[in-house]
Amino acid sequence: MNLRGVFQDFNPSKFLIYACLLLFSVLLSLRLDGIIQWSYWAVFAPIWLWKLMVIIGASVGTGVWAHNPQYRAEGETCVEFKAMLIAVGIHLLLLTFEVLVCERVERASIPYWLLVFMPLFFVSPVSVAACVWGFRHDRSLELEILCSVNILQFIFIALKLDGIISWPWLVVCVPLWILMSFLCLVVLYYIVWSVLFLRSMDVIAEQRRTHITMAISWMTIVVPLLTFEILLVHKLDNHYSPNYVPVFVPLWVSLVTLMVTTFGQKGGNHWWFGIRKDFCQFLLELFPFLREYGNISYDLHHEDSDMSEELPIHEVPKIPTMFRKKTGVVITQSPGKYFVPPPKLCIDMPD
């Protein structure tokens, strides 16, 4: 278990999003089953926390950008700052939609669901433009892709809720089934490649392990997600009688898996909260005592052999560096052995 690799590849932005979605789905299922009688404004509290962190992070990042013009000449700084602004714009539109949903459910002050879904209708074309910009600048935009491909699904759901169309929910979700079919093909692709790599002797163990991990991750995400959607559609069409909590269980499995995968995803915009560096380096500078734990790795298979090997007393072990930064700060691993210095020798001179 290499804690250094876990911290280096951690993506805090995605972890926050998946954690908020998981907590929101738990509260929503309990509210729909009547187990809790909270207001929907309270049920949406994890969503408000998510959007609040986005707004605060973007505000701090913009302030750092405005007060430090010298940072704008550093590599891909301008591209990352523009990507942050695009993400903030999309999140504000999503926040508007979520506020309208709560207002419609609590007070019914908005007569039509089409008006509630209007922010999502604006999000889709903006997301398409953001995806084009992201492809040109080699940026990963998962949220923008998700919003851009679901425009037809948003329209069908709004029409169904307003009673303009009387289709069953199984037909209303046809765009969703098309998207899930594509994801199932992706899962099949990873499974096939994993099997081929397992049977090939020319592939190194690291590549084989990576493809197997990807295949298992995609299966654990897509299969429970598809199960949740099928159960939800049958529940809405009155073909499934149990409560909403069993329906949401597969969704929780997918979200927990997504949270675990954030520890192996590099990336993240460095301009959130103006930290301008990887989240791991930021934590190590903010909390220096974490360096001792971040530099530890365990190898249970070679523990006995390592114990049998003794280093010479007069030989100073070389300590590999963990991070190298332009500022010249180097964080080194803690040495595995410490040697007691020899006692002080006193020589009495004869009279």
From Swiss-Prot:
Q: Which PANTHER family match?
A: FAM11A, B PROTEIN, TRANSMEMBRANE PROTEIN 185A
Question: Keywords for this entry?
Answer: Membrane, Transmembrane, Transmembrane helix
Q: Which family does it belong to?
A: Belongs to the TMEM185 family.
Q: Which GO terms describe its cellular component?
A: membrane
Natural source organism: Danio rerio
The UniProt entry lists membrane topology as: Multi-pass membrane protein
Q: Which domain of life is it from?
A: Eukaryota
Q: List the disulfide bonds.
A: none
* Protein name, entry field: Transmembrane protein 185-like
What Pfam family is a match, any one?
Tmemb_185A
Q: Does the keyword Kinase apply?
A: no
Q: Where in the cell is it found?
A: Membrane
